[in-house]
Amino acid sequence: MKFRHSFMALALALAVTLPIGAEDLSFDEIYSGYDAEGLTFSDKTTSLEGGTVTISGYMAPPLTPTIHFFVLTEVPMSVCPFCSSDADWPDNIIVVKVDDPITALPYDTPITVTGTLEIGSETDEETGFVSQLRIRADAIDS
C-alpha cells in the first residue's frame, strides 16, 4: 500500500511538471555528431520534429530589448552571441520563436521552454538570422 501511494505521488508530480505530450529534450541530445556538411541531428531530435518538446537553458542577450525570437543556450552567455565570430558560436543552442513580443530576461536566469520542434532552414525576415532548428514556444517558464 505504501508503494502504491509513493508511486501515485511520483506520477502526480511528473504530470504537474511536464505538459501533456511534451517530450524532454536536452542539449546533449540534439546532435549526434558532425559530417561534411556540419552538425547532424540525432535520431531523437529528428523523431521529435513537429512534436511538443520541453528544454531548459538560458536566454542569450537578444538583438533588441523586445523580441520575437531568442537563442536558448545551455549555459549563461553574458555577451551577444551574434557579435562573436563563427568560431565562437556555440553548438549547444536552439532558436525559440514567440508569437507575441517578449522582453528579454537576464542572461543568467534559468528558463524552461515548451513548444513545437521545427527542423529545416528558416530566415527571420526582420533580422536575416538563419536557423536550422527552432522551437515555436507555447510556454516559457523561469
Which residues are covered by each model-predicted region?
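Bacterial N-terminal signal peptides that target proteins for export
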Residues: 1-8
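Bacterial N-terminal signal peptides
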Residues: 9-17
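OB-fold and OB-like single-stranded nucleic-acid-recognition modules
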Residues: 21-142
